[in-house]
């Protein structure tokens, strides 16, 4: 694989603003000027030019400026400014202001919300398994209570009939139920009616939950 091919897959240098780009360029320019001052001092140049900067130093400065501009023109293809290509951002600075800088706190909050959604999905999946079984058990228990109550009522009725046969003069009533038995019967019937009405709706709601 060629080196050019390797370079094509490298990530671009990401800068947040045009000011960052200008700062990097100014640092690069300053470093070159420092090298120029070492190798072609301005004072020596003016002494050679009789008080004026000699032509050699002037030409070297021009070439170095061309080098700086050429270098940063080339690297613009590998630089982004606030998510935009450097060329586009530098030509129209408004482009680089359309996207907000990365917000770590906002990303953390989004991750927390995502985790809460995941937890909710797990909870719903758990309810899909447990809630129908709980309703079914409550329904079965209510039916068993009702059946046991009716069986007791039947036994009491038979017992009262036997007493009437054995003691016809004793006042007994096979048509009057004890108040607590009636209340218990009504409560059981209410439970069964509630479960019968709400169980299909609860199951359907859980099945529709994503």
Swiss-Prot record:
Its main location: nucleus. One of its GO terms (cellular component) is nucleus. Keywords: Cell cycle, Cell division, Centromere, Chromosome, Kinetochore, Meiosis, Mitosis, Nucleus. GO terms for biological process: cell division; meiotic cell cycle; mitotic sister chromatid segregation. InterPro entries: Mis14/Nsl1. The keyword Transit peptide does not apply. Pfam families: Mis14. It comes from the Eukaryota. The keyword Nucleus applies. Acts as a component of the NMS (Ndc80-MIND-Spc7) super complex which has a role in kinetochore function during late meiotic prophase and throughout the mitotic cell cycle. Required for correct chromosome segregation where it has a role in the formation and/or maintenance of specialized chromatin at the centromere. Component of the NMS super complex which consists of mis12, mis13, mis14, ndc80, nnf1, nuf2, sos7, spc7, spc24 and spc25. Interacts with mis12. This is Kinetochore protein mis14.
